Amino acid sequence: MHFTPALKPGKLLKRYKRFLADVQLEDGSEITVHCPNTGSMRNCLFPGETLWFSTSSNTKRKYAHTWELMTTPTGALIGIHSGNANALVEEALNKGIITELTGYDSLRREVKYGDENSRIDILLECAQKTACYIEVKSCTLQENGQGYFPDAVSLRGQKHLRELMHMASLGHRAVLLFVVQHTDIMSVAPAAHIDPEYANLLKKSVLSGVEVLAYRCEISPSEIHLAQSCPVRV
């Protein structure tokens, strides 16, 4: 995924009201940007450090700028835009980067499924294979090189695990795919210290036949894309 037009830098001042952040530009002026991340953004907020934002040509938007990347004090880059995760996975699937998920003929997004009124992020289908239901999660919480999910108690995430277990029980292929949008994360684990119920459900999911994958992103101010798999420590 290329950032077009090019991202612009600024210094993070503060995030507030979940969806807004104040940014200082290189000329000293300040703007407010949209924050496209509904999570806690734990360990992703570094006031005074450089962030990168995109600019929309849509004049009807209240906030023309969108926060895309955050630079950490160690120089790592974090993909803040959690909404990019599904598009990154679709791009990687089309290029054959996710080797565990090749050989399907069709890809559909946001398809209704399960018994808890859910929509699957990506559904892969092929006449010669069982359908593959993929739930995508963006992982940005990093502690000592270890990535964790979720970064706050996630009832929605728990529901998605139950739905995946249900699909696996029906004989379908069910996959949980972590998109690692933090260049300092080398492996992913459930955040049992934050959401123990999610961690328990994840272990149960694996025993029930749900596959768990994680792919690290290569990130720069010019582009972001899935690059290589990394371990998941359930």
Swiss-Prot record:
According to the lineage, what is the superkingdom? Bacteria
Pfam families the UniProt entry points to: SfsA, SfsA_N
MF terms (GO), sorted A to Z: DNA binding
Gene3D superfamilies listed in its UniProt record: 2.40.50.580, 3.40.1350.60
Fetch the InterPro entries from UniProt. Answer: SfsA (IPR005224), SfsA_C (IPR040452), SfsA_N (IPR041465)
**Database matches in PANTHER family:** SUGAR FERMENTATION STIMULATION PROTEIN A
Q: Which family does it belong to?
A: Belongs to the SfsA family.
HAMAP family listed in its UniProt record: SfsA
Its name, as the record gives it, is Sugar fermentation stimulation protein homolog
Its source organism is: Shewanella oneidensis (strain ATCC 700550 / JCM 31522 / CIP 106686 / LMG 19005 / NCIMB 14063 / MR-1)
